[in-house]
Amino acid sequence: MNKTVVIKEFGGSDQLKIVDMPAGEPGDGQVRIAHKACGLNYIDVYQRTGLYPLSLPQALGMEAAGVIEAVGAGVTHVKVGDRVAYASMPPGSYCERRVMPAAQVCPLPDEISFEQGAAMMLQGMTVQYLFHRTTPLSKGDTVLFHAAAGGVGLIACQWAKSEGITLIGTAGSDEKCQLALDHGAMHCINYTTENFEEKVKELTGGAGVDVVMDSVGESTFEGSLNSLKPLGMMITFGNASGPVPPFNLAQLGAKGSLKITRPTLFTHIGKHEDCQEMARHLFSKVISGDVKIVIGQEFALDDVTAAHDALEARRTTGSTILTV
């Protein structure tokens, strides 16, 4: 049996079904991987609910780590028996084994566990492109990072500290703020008790920040724009509170010639060479100790419904994985 989590209709976590789906043999440019652990991310929720529409029925999951069982013709960068990890389209990582394109499958160093590998690829490479591929950031710059105690946020806190970048985080409780501070945030604002826009201005002496990195979406968008200094960059890379509504682009000029972008990881890792380079950079950060991967929750694959419920209810900190 090859347990695989699929959805046949969009909706709540009750739409997650475990079925037996044969993995098959890899074709040209493909590999078959026996998974040891799978990562859980908010994009999986977006896909399950239909916010990011998929053709149905569809297996879910965007990242995992495991061992290569078979390789197809033309695959040269990994071989049978290699430890690997990936974050990649198409979805389908919530399973015991799968056949998938090899281009975004990355050799996993022995120093990094399968659990860490499954927990870090999508979130870690997201941080890599946010700090190195979206807008130039230099030592001494200041970043406002929403959801700083989540999986992406805790990696970002550590990454920023390792590169001399001041990170101001936001989180929904004092406990989560302390977690962000413990991982390298210079400041963290509890948005349930303080107005983050006003607090950012206070912390920056009225200047604002160079860059905002926002995965929350609708509820933080306006305040994020108002937290930027003139010529600042707004990076909106998620919609946890709902999608950003349409707005008048003239606001960007009125607020100080601001810039805005809506990147996705899968554009950045679309080329094999870029993906492998980004993964090597991430692995080096982890092996050096600059970044520690915090796995806050582990669920068995059979408990995927409970895992989604915890993620949507914002009861999670750090990364969440499914063990196989």
Residue ranges and their predicted role:
Residues 161-220, 271-273:
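Adenosine-nucleotide cofactor-binding segment
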Residues 86-147, 159:
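NAD(P)H dinucleotide-binding glycine-rich loop of Rossmann-like/cofactor-binding domains
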Residues 22-39, 49-92:
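Glycine-rich beta-strand-centered segment in the early N-terminal region that forms part
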Residues 272-324:
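C-terminal hydrophobic helical "lid"/dimerization subdomain
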Residues 163, 219-290, 324:
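Glycine-rich phosphate-binding loop and adjacent beta-alpha segment
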Residues 147-148, 216:
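NAD(P)H cofactor-binding loop motif with strongest signal on the N-terminal glycine-rich segment
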Residues 152:
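Hydrophobic/small residue at the entry helix of a nucleotide-binding pocket
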